[in-house]
Each structure stands twice: as C-alpha cells, then as structure tokens.
Design a protein with these regions (language model features):
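Phosphoinositide-binding peripheral membrane targeting modules
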Residues: 56-114
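Acidic/proline-rich low-complexity IDRs
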Residues: 32, 127, 133, 163-165
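Hydrophobic, Leu/Ile/Phe/Ala-enriched alpha-helical segments that form helix-helix packing faces
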Residues: 24, 28-32, 117-119, 147, ...
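Generic structural motif
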Residues: 100, 120-122, 135-137
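Anionic N-terminal interaction surfaces
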Residues: 1-72
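Short amphipathic beta-strand/extended segments with alternating polar/hydrophobic composition
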Residues: 92-97, 126-136
Length: 174
C-alpha cells in the first residue's frame, strides 16, 4: 500500500493550492514563458494525506510530510510539476516535452496510480526516472492521457528503422 491517500482533480491554475500556484507563476515569469493562463492546456492537483502509522515507525523514519500538494501543468512545450509538503517545502520541476517520455501507471500492490516520467528535466545532468503519484479518480487518467498525447505530438516517434544511423537495409535502401 502507498503511504498516502491521494485525491486528484482537474482544475484551473487559479484553483491550485497557493504555494503551487505561486511557484508556477514565478517559473513562468523567470523563464518568460508567456501568460500562464493562456499557455496552459491542462492543469490538475493531487492532495496526498499521510496514512496513520505507529509512533515507532514515525520515529525511525523521521518527520515526513503529513500532507503533500502536487500540481501538474501542461503547455504545448512544457510539463511542469510542483510539490509542496508541510515539512519539505516547495519543489518545482519542469521538462521540455521533446526531452521526456511518460507512461500511465496503475499498480495494485502498492495501490497507486499516476504518471511515470523518464528523460531530462530542466537542470538535470543526467536522465531521470520517477513517478508523480495521483489518486484513483477519472481526472488522473484524463490528465495522464493529455500529457502522453502532448509528448507524442511534440516528439513523434520515428517510423523508419535505423541501424547505426543508416536506414534499415544499408545505404540507399529503406
């Protein structure tokens, strides 16, 4: 089981938790990405609430966030996701859609759903692979599908087979 109970909803940027909205607005302003509302294709928010655990486990693991807010924003070129935890503070990640791959995941053990991302977010020195945990609501699947479609549109898969940089079959053959 996941350590958190999660709920996800599709929303407008103005409906995001205040810390999430402010972090995204600051990122848009700092990187001159245009008007936040005009550029947004899709936005969703997940609230993750820590499940009850016994005091010994809590003591061994140290203080962890009781509540985590996660916002995910999609534009035609960017995927931006930001977390705000009551202990960990605010952390924003952004990736150009041409530099990432995403898949919907829905696991039964632990019971969890969300978006699995691999690629190169802004500032990463090497590729990453991680997950954005989301709730069981239909909004999760819709948001994930929109991200996956946007990535495919920004970076369509090659239909031609290549071996060592040459078309399959050697030079001059396709």
């Amino acid at each position: 089981m996941s350590d958190y109970n999660r709920t996800t909803r599709e929303c407008s940027v103005s409906q995001l938790h205040a810390e999430l909205r402010q972090a995204i607005q600051n990122y848009f302003t700092e990187h001159r990405l245009g008007s936040l509302e005009a550029e947004t294709l899709m936005c969703c928010e997940t609230i993750s609430e820590k499940k009850s655990i016994n005091k010994l486990v809590s003591w061994l693991n140290g203080k962890s966030d009781a509540t985590i807010y996660t916002g995910m924003l999609l534009t035609s070129e960017w995927l931006i996701w930001v977390h705000h935890g009551d202990q960990s503070g605010t952390r924003l990640n952004a990736a150009n859609l041409k530099l990432i791959h995403a898949e919907f995941y829905n696991s039964r053990i632990p019971k969890d759903a969300g978006l699995q991302i691999s690629g190169f977010p802004v500032g990463a020195k090497e590729g990453i692979r991680g997950q954005i945990g989301m709730g069981p609501e239909m909004a999760t699947q819709k948001c994930c599908e929109e991200v996956i479609k946007a990535i495919a549109k920004a970076n369509p898969p090659s239909t031609q087979k290549h071996i060592f940089g040459l078309p399959f079959g050697g030079p001059g053959k396709t």
